Amino acid sequence: MRKLLLFSLLCMLLPVAAAAAPEGACDGVTVGAADTAAYFPLLRGRRVAVLANQTSRVGDEHLVDLLHRSGVRLTAIFSPEHGFRGTADAGEHVASSVDERTGVPIRSLYDGRTRRPSDEAMRSFDVLLVDMQDVGLRFYTYYISMLRMMDSCADFGRAVVVLDRPNPNGSYIDGPVLDMKYKSGVGALPIPVVHGLTMGEIARMAVGEGWAKPCDLTVVPCRRYTHATRYELPVAPSPNLPTQRSIYLYPSICLFEGTVVSLGRGTDRPFECYGHPDMPADRYGFVFTPRPTAGAKHPPLEGRLCRGVDLSEKPCEEILAEGL
């Protein structure tokens, strides 16, 4: 009951996180990974590792396959939260394995240990490529995995090349800056909740501000991208952000993750609805029942009928213009 009350209070206190509707489409944007002329020379004659997942694509081809086909000496794949294939639950332990197509070892940073690479793994490569699609939230963990790898690369004298991608929530900044006494695995830098930065910008800022150890860092930027560019993701960044609408709603909806309310995990509308069994039927006509699904094996309130609010029909343009 106390958590349900907290949810109600948060609903009243939550500021409207409205963004100026970005102009332009994503058609003209070229992601860093596609600019091979900018980074292939940095890989020549060197052992290469990648920090990558299912979003690391160049057109219809995965970055790992592109590197392998191009004769790059690929010696390791490091995988972040949700695993290399992006199917694991939030925070789920994922065992290391081998990429079937290339035979390259996949070293999971979420294997239940330190979430950092081993000394053995660090000795297996000379340069690290980072290519993952972020969504622009402080508690979204891909940038934290990148920072941990950057620190290890600084310790071992390894070069880091970040292949940048647009931030789909990059047109605005909102929320408080993290008090670093609360630094954790879901918040690693003194930045706002909605920080507006790309992965490459985070990497540069972290080194420049002294938040990360100095390392040999190169960022390959996106072409024809600004923070006013509306960019629709071609691949879901994680199992419970399957649509562009869920990505736009995530900054507001995820704030209630610590309450008793279901946020749609275990439904076909994750982060596009919310509810609880005790929400009154006379005020909340929408009902749903969380069930085990890929990426949500044991969702909150599993098997219980919840009443709440359905946001799955809310137009993306309205979310961008007015917030939630």
Which ranges hold each PLM region?
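Conserved anion/nucleotide-ligand pocket segment
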Residues: K183-I253
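Glycine-rich, charge-decorated loop segments at or immediately adjacent to ligand/cofactor-binding or catalytic sites
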Residues: G86-G91, V161-K183
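Glycine/threonine-rich flexible loop motifs
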Residues: D134-M146
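Conserved functional hotspot residues or short segments at active or partner-binding sites
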Residues: P270, G275-L324
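Short internal beta-strands
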Residues: T75-H82, L163
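Bacterial N-terminal signal peptides
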Residues: F7-P15
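Glycine-rich oxoanion-binding loops at beta->alpha junctions
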Residues: V94-F125, L137
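N-terminal phosphate-binding or glycine-rich loops at protein starts, especially the Walker A/P-loop
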Residues: C26-V72
